[in-house]
């Protein structure tokens, strides 16, 4: 095992999808002497990357966000970590149908092709297990897909190492930082200190905690996103991959339903705000699943269960389809909702 260096041009703290991406792109830009550290094990150090649902809808009213998303999808495809399955945003109200036509307009404006407004019957053709009588229609976008984020991160990290630009170290926790004249000069860890010209904090829901060590602030708040996986679903019995059927996005209820192998994943953003401080997130050793997978609070999901039963009753209402996995997953959110 390589010894932790005492000096580096740049220390990247964090080995989730963001930290690995930064490491890879710095290496591609010609940077050398990069050191990446994470307090968890690899390839899944225990952050949000390991449990995120990882689907991408490419359309946004913001031109900048749409273009960033398009470039991200391009890179994931190049890595071989993107599965295109299509997706349908459904509408329960006339107002939502109007919004979906606006999204089509934005898609065309930003050069995103292939999307179309679909009737309830057409939604049923695309997603046979949906209850078409409770929707007025939808917006079908065939280029929606799912990313294998752990594999993508692993490949990016490995490519940076193969370029001779980087070293990566797992199970090393940052304990402090030395700051001089407003710049981080030294990263202190359990296994020694690293002097660095540059330091990148890419630790997701722990970022605010590490920023404090540097006498600064990163406006990220650990917040719960509830999700559960139910199955096995008879309709998915012959599935060969992770996903073959379009993802359902229901913005009227702030929920989604997506196939996950032989199961159905149901996620919600409609529950009450459940917020934490970074200091409340347990260590890898103390966590039952992973540090960012908190125990599921069913009472916060009761209404969402009703919504999912209404939309996909043939699956959610099947007594033989049981809950396989459910978490209060921790994501990091900003005050402006980005």
Predicted region positions:
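Glycine-rich Rossmann-fold phosphate-binding loop(s) that bind the pyrophosphate
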Residues: 15-20, 39, 203
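Short beta-strand to alpha-helix junction loop
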Residues: 67-70, 89-99, 139-161, 169, ...
């Amino acid at each position: 095992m390589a010894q932790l260096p005492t000096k580096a041009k740049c220390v990247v703290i964090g080995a989730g999808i963001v930290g690995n991406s930064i490491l890879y792109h710095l290496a591609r830009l010609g940077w050398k002497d990069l050191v990446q550290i994470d307090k968890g094990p690899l390839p899944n150090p225990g952050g949000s990357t390991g449990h995120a649902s990882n689907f991408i809808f490419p359309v946004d009213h913001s031109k900048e966000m749409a273009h960033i998303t398009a470039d991200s999808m391009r890179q994931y495809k190049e890595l071989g970590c993107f599965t295109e399955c299509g997706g349908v945003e459904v509408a329960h109200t006339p107002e939502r149908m109007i919004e979906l036509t606006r999204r089509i307009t934005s898609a065309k404006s930003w050069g995103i092709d292939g999307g179309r407004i679909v009737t309830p019957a057409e939604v049923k053709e695309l997603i046979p297990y949906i209850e078409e009588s409770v929707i007025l229609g939808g917006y079908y976008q065939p280029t929606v897909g799912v990313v294998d984020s752990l594999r993508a991160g692993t490949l990016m990290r490995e490519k940076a190492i193969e370029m001779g630009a980087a070293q990566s170290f797992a199970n090393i926790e940052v304990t402090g930082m030395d700051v001089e004249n407003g710049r981080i000069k030294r990263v202190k860890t359990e296994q020694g200190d690293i002097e660095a010209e540059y330091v990148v904090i890419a630790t997701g829901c722990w970022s605010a905690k590490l920023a404090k060590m540097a006498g600064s602030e990163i406006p990220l708040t650990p917040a719960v996103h509830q999700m559960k996986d139910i199955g096995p679903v008879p309709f998915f019995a012959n599935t060969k991959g992770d996903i073959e059927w379009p993802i359902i996005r229901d913005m009227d209820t702030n929920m989604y339903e997506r196939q996950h192998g032989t199961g159905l994943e149901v996620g919600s953003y409609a529950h009450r705000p459940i917020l934490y401080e970074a200091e409340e997130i347990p260590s890898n050793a103390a966590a039952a699943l992973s540090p960012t997978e908190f125990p599921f609070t069913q009472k916060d999901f009761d209404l969402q269960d009703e919504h999912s039963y209404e939309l996909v009753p043939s699956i959610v209402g099947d007594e033989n389809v049981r809950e396989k996995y459910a978490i209060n997953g921790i994501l990091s959110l900003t005050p402006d909702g980005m």
